């Protein structure tokens, strides 16, 4: 049956797309397959910003055999000029007969326009098969274009009783090596990492990707976003050693400190000794950063929760009890009754 074949090839396109998840940010992960007479004659995936799109690679491999073939792709092909030519023009030029797409591209530059133009040029279009899988794969990209702000994933490692450190702030190690390895993977898949001066100063943290299995798949380290209201982080800190990594420091004061050229100071409004998070998120969005991985202590996390800015939590829970005097993963104090609870779903 045609439906079964369509599902089969779209599933393969999604698997191809996943190969780019570590290097494609801020672009979406896309895989494409060209099929003719029940045979795959071309396939490809988008590897990194500025490189050929999945459809372009697949159609190039298919060559002149593309005429009359079916193109399977998990995201609507682009129709605008960016760092690469529009895929739409090539699909029409290669005389593709049918295009099967999982989901529309929410980017306002596309968002259904390519589908209309494909149909206008006599190409049969099928939309919506494996849509949920496709949307999930590119949930951060989709969120950015639907809501005009980065998708925020907040990570916390804690004990069974919700503690992230003992009463002296000792936290090495509450969680397991497997958890820490998973954090490396999450960093590698992120467009940026957000933390605070307190977190960085405490451990002289680098907050980067170090595992070879993930590092080898990256083009660059994810940019680091630091909340440092009074610019307390010493210039000798490890985070400043890698001058190839983009660092944004959000502060409310002026300074004569001499930072390297990879460091951007962002003057940020503050209130009650707290930086304005909504200003920061809006600024980050303007830098074409479509998702943020939060690694911080309880104060920033609590502020993000209070401002309704956390889209997803990632909890690593260790089978340990640290007791009432240990430090909680949040510092929210305005909730005292069940009726004041903040609801989430698993």
PLM features per residue range, with description:
Residues 34-133, 305:
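Zn2+-dependent cytidine deaminase-like catalytic core
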